[in-house]
């Protein structure tokens, strides 16, 4: 653990929105008088009908979470219309294409017209308030238009990452019973086409077999690639928007009306539809964007995430646009045409604030400093990290090489369920420690709890819980409130359990140590082990599978699969079968779930009651089998010797 302390930089302190004194004062107010604090900050967005109630939350019993519940507003109005008078000609979105020679700037006025046209297309084809619309798009401006158009008319969007497979897309269409899909002919990533329309067609066929019928598919022409066409179902976006008005009145939405569903992996197989609502979410996304990134008007802000993840929702689209910021959307990848792409984009668009994932940083660090130092990066003022804990070595490289020791780093901890950043440094207020997310944001009350549920005070290790609500918190799992309660509120009564382990040091700083449940963090993206196991077992050669994580130099965690085969299947060439299983998992879930190691085993370590002892599998995957602990409860201890002998990760 790093003991180095980096004091607040004088330059950061000079112009900051929040210094340490203000942080301590506001934080105290936010936890001692949440109603007063959030009433004040709730007014940062515009309300059609002001709220009179602020906080109505209970983490016990049936778990109810309501913020600003009698207020009426509209997210699209707050992200666009309210800026038109003073910022109509300001650039809202800078779009940087996969090809380094293609970009586009969209002003707030142009954003208004594009969003209104798309909203009118949705209405024309029967989409109403409360309907679920699935968005399966690459990182193009139309992805933001689609989200904002749904918000404008009160439809609930479900964005599915364009790297997910047709099977994964179908599961998400079925779960929220979506009948309208927005996609593109193809996406482009790293110079290669991605067959989005083809994937969508396949997904719709799969959904139909589960009695969910998609009626309309709106197709954005991105590449002009050849696509098959469903007559009466498929619509070209460019043709549809040309025939509708560029004005659409925003639908008045109650603060607790749903805004979006975003699916995230859980420790059981089926992804959970995380439901976020309107008022509290936008207050929290816009407030965290302003204060965590110390955002000043006129700055260029770039979050490298994809809108298919929550980081893209909160910190590419909703947070920045609610604040009237200029937000950069990047279609490409960090290593195309080469590993200097990020820094060339920073120079090209004069980026001031840069927010990315440790995975990307580790990969770029490994490519050598010359890809960074050939760019000037002189406009950079602040750096951010998101998605997983950043190891101190990568932090130091980011600070020294990318930031030239002049940019504070905000190492942010939060989750899909949280809506916005929960634990983070504030650049003008917080001394930094490489690898630590430091202190809670306003209104956030972290608690460390041991496995028996005892709250740990002072310096401690434990399970990270949050003891009270904040406005950006998810409200339920879509269609399954029981699962919401069981997943987050049943382990430790009266508290939200994050699923992460954490350490608090002598300065009260928080250090996230990783997942404590059966969820992996791969390149900053969550994947449930049960999801990958289900994909493996659906292959005809596989009898049983167990999946664990292991330390990976680039991705943070790698995917290690233990597989027992059906009788007779072991006659196949093991290398060929491994390749086949890798492709099978990619097809079932998507490239993000590509297994790194597959070990064939005659059996898995199980207790006499049949429970797989994952602790043992994790140790073997980490090549640390000298400390396996008590194995006396195993039904067949001999299984372990075989696993050790044939491990795929021998150092």
Curated annotation (Swiss-Prot):
Residues engaged in binding Mg(2+): 537, 539, 542
Post-translational modification: Acetylated. Deacetylation by the SIR2-homolog deacetylase activates the enzyme.
Catalysis performed (reactions): acetate + ATP + CoA = acetyl-CoA + AMP + diphosphate
Location of N6-acetyllysine modifications: 611
Positions annotated to bind ATP: 387-389, 411-416, 500, 515, 526
Residues annotated as binding CoA: 189-192, 311, 335, 523, 586
GO annotations of cellular component type: cytosol
Pfam families xrefs: ACAS_N, AMP-binding, AMP-binding_C
Cofactor(s) required for function per UniProt: Mg(2+)
GO biological process, one term: acetyl-CoA biosynthetic process from acetate
Top-level lineage group: Bacteria
Keywords linked to the UniProt accession: Acetylation, ATP-binding, Ligase, Magnesium, Metal-binding, Nucleotide-binding
EC number: 6.2.1.1
A molecular-function term among this protein's GO annotations: AMP binding
EC category name: ligase
PANTHER family noted in UniProt: ACETYL-COENZYME A SYNTHETASE (PTHR24095), ACETYL-COENZYME A SYNTHETASE 1 (PTHR24095:SF14)
Family under the similarity heading: Belongs to the ATP-dependent AMP-binding enzyme family.
Role played: Catalyzes the conversion of acetate into acetyl-CoA (AcCoA), an essential intermediate at the junction of anabolic and catabolic pathways. AcsA undergoes a two-step reaction. In the first half reaction, AcsA combines acetate with ATP to form acetyl-adenylate (AcAMP) intermediate. In the second half reaction, it can then transfer the acetyl group from AcAMP to the sulfhydryl group of CoA, forming the product AcCoA.
Protein name: Acetyl-coenzyme A synthetase
Organism of provenance: Brucella canis (strain ATCC 23365 / NCTC 10854 / RM-666)
Record lineage: Bacteria, Pseudomonadati, Pseudomonadota, Alphaproteobacteria, Hyphomicrobiales
Gene name in the database record: acsA
């Amino acid at each position: 653990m790093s003991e180095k302390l980096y004091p607040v930089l004088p330059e950061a302190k000079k112009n900051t929105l929040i210094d340490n004194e203000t942080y301590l004062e506001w934080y105290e107010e936010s936890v001692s008088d949440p109603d007063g604090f959030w009433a004040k900050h709730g007014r940062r967005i515009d309300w059609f009908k002001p709220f009179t109630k602020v906080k109505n939350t209970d983490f016990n019993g049936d778990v109810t979470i309501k913020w600003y519940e009698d207020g009426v507003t509209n997210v699209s109005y707050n992200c666009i219309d309210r800026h038109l008078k003073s910022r109509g000609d300001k650039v809202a979105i800078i779009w940087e294409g996969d090809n380094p020679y293609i970009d586009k700037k969209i002003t707030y006025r142009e954003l208004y017209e594009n969003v209104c046209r798309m909203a009118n297309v949705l209405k024309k084809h029967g989409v109403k308030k409360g309907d679920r619309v699935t968005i399966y798009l690459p990182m193009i401006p139309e992805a933001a238009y689609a989200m904002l158009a749904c918000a404008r008319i009160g439809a609930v969007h479900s964005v599915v990452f364009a790297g997910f497979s047709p099977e994964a897309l179908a599961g998400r269409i079925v779960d929220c019973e979506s009948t309208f899909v927005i996609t593109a002919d193809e996406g482009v990533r790293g110079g290669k086409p991605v067959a989005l329309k083809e994937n969508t067609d396949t997904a719709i066929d799969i959904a139909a077999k589960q009695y969910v019928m998609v009626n309309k598919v709106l197709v954005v022409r991105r590449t002009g690639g050849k696509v098959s066409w469903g007559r009466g179902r498929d619509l070209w976006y460019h043709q549809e928007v040309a025939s509708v008005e560029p004005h659409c009145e925003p639908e008045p939405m109650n603060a607790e009306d749903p805004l979006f569903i975003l699916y995230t992996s859980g420790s059981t197989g089926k992804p959970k539809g995380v439901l976020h609502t309107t008022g509290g979410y936008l207050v929290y996304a816009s407030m965290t964007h302003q204060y965590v990134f110390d955002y000043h008007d006129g700055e260029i802000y770039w979050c490298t995430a994809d809108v298919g993840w929550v980081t893209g929702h909160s910190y590419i689209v909703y947070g920045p646009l609610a604040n009237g910021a200029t937000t950069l959307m990047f279609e490409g990848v960090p290593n195309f045409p080469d590993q200097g792409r990020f820094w060339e984009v920073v120079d090209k668009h004069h980026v001031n604030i840069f927010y990315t994932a440790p995975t990307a940083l580790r990969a770029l660090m490994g490519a050598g400093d010359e890809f960074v130092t050939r760019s000037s990066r002189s406009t950079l003022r602040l750096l951010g990290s998101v998605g997983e804990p950043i190891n101190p070595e990568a932090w130091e490289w980011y600070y020294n090489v990318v930031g030239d020791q002049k940019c504070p780093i905000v190492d942010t901890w939060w989750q899909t369920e949280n809506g916005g950043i929960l634990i983070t440094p504030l650049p003008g207020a917080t001394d930094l420690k490489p690898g630590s997310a430091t202190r809670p944001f306003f209104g956030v009350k972290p608690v460390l709890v041991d496995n028996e549920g005892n709250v740990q005070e002072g310096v401690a290790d434990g399970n990270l819980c949050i003891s009270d609500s904040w406005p950006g918190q998810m409200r339920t799992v879509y269609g399954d409130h029981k699962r919401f309660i069981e997943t987050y509120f049943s382990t430790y009564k009266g508290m939200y359990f994050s699923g992460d382990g954490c350490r608090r040091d002598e300065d009260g700083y928080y250090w996230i140590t990783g997942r404590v449940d059966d969820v992996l963090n791969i390149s900053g993206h969550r994947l449930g082990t049960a999801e990958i196991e289900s994909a493996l077992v659906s292959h005809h050669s596989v009898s049983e599978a167990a999946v664990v994580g292991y330390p990976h130099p680039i991705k943070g965690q790698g995917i290690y699969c233990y597989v027992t085969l059906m009788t007779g299947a072991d006659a196949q060439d093991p290398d060929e079968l491994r390749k086949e299983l890798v492709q099978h998992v990619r097809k079932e879930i998507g490239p993000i779930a590509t297994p790194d190691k597959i070990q064939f085993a005659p059996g898995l370590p199980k207790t006499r009651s049949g429970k797989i002892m994952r602790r043992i599998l994790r140790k073997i995957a980490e090549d640390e089998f000298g400390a396996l602990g008590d194995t006396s409860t195993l039904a067949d201890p001999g299984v372990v010797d075989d696993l050790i002998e044939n491990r795929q990760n021998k150092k």
